[in-house]
Amino acid sequence: MEFIVYLAGEIHSNWREEIKEKTKSLKLPITFVGPMENHDRSDNIGEEIMGVQPNAVLKDDKASDINNFRTAVLMNKADFVIALFGEKYKQWNTAMDASYAIAKGKPLIIIRPESLHHPLKELSNKANITVETVNQAIKALSYLFETE
């Protein structure tokens, strides 16, 4: 059995690599997908595809169209979603992706520090699992493959 997992969350730290390395070391048959991790490319993809836009609002709008398309396609292919909420960055896209997963009936693991319990309580309540660390999420992934 093999799974595709969409990794939703901020693109400024290496948390995705940490998950990929740890699941690889456990030999878990998982393929990971997610948003464009190159922030500049993500911001500029609209103009890269559609040409230069007349202002910053339209530039952002075109980039959002393409990034939302990417998210929809990859999340629809995913078996489930892991969404990481950290304390350092605003998490609007993570919240949007987690909500999309819930709306599509995709199983969802939320990783969030205890300090974000209150602002994320409703979202956490809709997730299948809410944990505080990447290691706890990895243990949940590993459990999928255990037979005893």
UniProtKB/Swiss-Prot annotation:
Pfam families with a match to the protein in the record: Nuc_deoxyri_tr3
Gene3D superfamilies for this protein: 3.40.50.450
Domain of life: Bacteria
InterPro entries assigned to the protein according to its UniProt record, in alphabetical order: YtoQ_family_protein (IPR019884)
Name of the protein in question: Uncharacterized protein YtoQ
Protein's organism: Bacillus subtilis (strain 168)
Phylogenetic placement of the source organism: Bacteria, Bacillati, Bacillota, Bacilli, Bacillales
Gene label: ytoQ
